[in-house]
C-alpha cells in the first residue's frame, strides 16, 4: 500500500514510519509512506502557508496555492489511482467498517488540515472523501491521519504476523474483544479461566465468543443493536447475562 501525506509537520510521521508494526511494514516494503510539505511550494521568503478568511472571523485558513501545488505533486508521485482524503471534523466518523473499506485501496493521499481548515473549493475539487476520528476538535489532521494509517495498514497482507489478529480484534466482527491472559496462571490471587488451559479448541472458541458478546453488552450495548446475531450468539449472550445476574446475587 502507498500512502501520501500532505502536512505542515511531516516530521510527526516518523512515529509511523520508524516504529512498531507500521515501521516494520515500511522496512519490508509492504507499506510506503511519503510526505509533502506545503511550505516547500511557497514563493515568498517567509514561506507563508496561511491566509485570512473572507468574511472575517477568528483564525486563519491554509493558503490555497501552496496546498494545491502540494496535492498535485503528491498525485503525480502516486503509483496509481489514488483516493484523496481530507481529515476533518465534518467527515464520516472512522469505524472498523470504514477502516476495512479504506484498506481496499492500494493508494491513499491524506490531507492534514491546520489552522481553521482549508478553502471549501479545494475540498470540492481535490478531495474524494472526508473522514473524522471523532466528535472533538484537534489542532491539526496529523494525529487523525496517523490513526487512519495505523488501522488501515493492519489489513495489508503480510503486515501482521498472523492475519487472524486483525480479524479477531475488537470491532472486527462488530463486537468488543474478549479478555486475554498470559503467564503466570495465578496473579494476585486471580486465576486464568480453566477453559483456556484445557486444550479444547471448540470450548475455547465458545468461551471467547461468549465473553466478547458479554463485554459488548456491558460496555457498548448500542453495538448489538446493529448486529443480526446467530442462534449460537443469542444463546451465548443469554448465558452470559444469566451468569452475570447470578454472580450479583
Curated annotation (Swiss-Prot):
Recorded catalytic reaction(s): these are: guanosine(37) in tRNA + S-adenosyl-L-methionine = N(1)-methylguanosine(37) in tRNA + S-adenosyl-L-homocysteine + H(+)
- Summarize where S-adenosyl-L-methionine binds, as residue positions: 113, 133-138
Q: What is its EC number?
A: 2.1.1.228
Q: Which GO terms describe its biological process?
A: tRNA N1-guanine methylation
Instruction: List the keywords (alphabetical).
Output: Cytoplasm, Methyltransferase, S-adenosyl-L-methionine, Transferase, tRNA processing
The UniProt entry's GO CC annotations, sorted and at most eight, read: cytosol
According to the UniProt entry, its GO molecular function terms are: tRNA (guanine(37)-N1)-methyltransferase activity
So what does this one do? Specifically methylates guanosine-37 in various tRNAs.
**Protein name stated in the entry:** tRNA (guanine-N(1)-)-methyltransferase
Annotated organism of origin? Vibrio vulnificus (strain YJ016)
| Recorded name of the encoding gene | trmD
Amino acid at each position: 500500500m502507498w500512502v501520501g501525506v500532505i502536512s505542515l509537520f511531516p516530521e510527526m510521521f516518523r512515529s509511523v514510519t520508524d516504529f512498531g508494526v507500521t515501521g516494520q511494514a515500511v522496512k519490508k516494503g509492504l507499506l510506503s509512506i511519503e510526505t509533502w510539505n506545503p511550505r516547500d511550494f511557497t514563493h515568498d521568503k517567509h514561506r507563508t502557508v496561511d491566509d485570512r478568511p473572507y468574511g472575517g472571523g477568528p483564525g486563519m485558513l491554509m493558503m490555497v496555492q501552496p496546498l494545491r501545488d502540494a496535492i498535485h505533486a503528491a498525485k503525480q508521485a502516486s503509483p496509481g489511482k489514488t483516493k484523496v482524503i481530507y481529515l476533518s471534523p465534518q467527515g464520516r466518523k472512522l469505524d472498523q467498517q470504514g477502516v476495512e473499506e479504506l484498506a481496499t485501496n492500494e493508494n491513499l493521499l491524506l490531507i492534514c488540515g491546520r489552522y481553521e481548515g482549508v478553502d471549501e473549493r479545494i475540498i470540492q475539487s481535490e478531495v474524494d472523501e472526508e473522514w473524522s476520528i471523532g466528535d472533538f476538535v484537534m489542532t491539526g489532521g496529523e494525529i487523525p491521519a496517523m490513526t487512519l494509517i495505523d488501522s488501515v495498514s493492519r489489513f495489508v497482507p503480510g503486515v501482521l504476523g498472523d492475519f487472524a489478529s486483525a480479524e479477531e480484534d475488537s470491532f472486527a466482527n462488530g463486537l468488543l474483544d474478549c479478555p486475554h491472559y498470559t503467564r503466570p496462571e495465578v496473579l494476585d490471587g486471580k486465576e486464568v479461566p480453566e477453559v483456556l488451559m484445557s486444550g479444547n479448541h471448540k470450548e475455547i472458541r465458545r468461551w471467547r465468543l461468549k465473553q466478547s458478546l458479554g463485554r459488548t453488552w456491558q460496555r457498548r450495548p448500542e453495538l448489538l443493536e446493529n448486529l443480526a446475531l446467530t442462534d449460537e450468539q443469542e444463546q451465548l449472550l443469554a448465558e452470559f447475562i444469566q451468569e452475570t445476574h447470578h454472580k450479583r446475587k
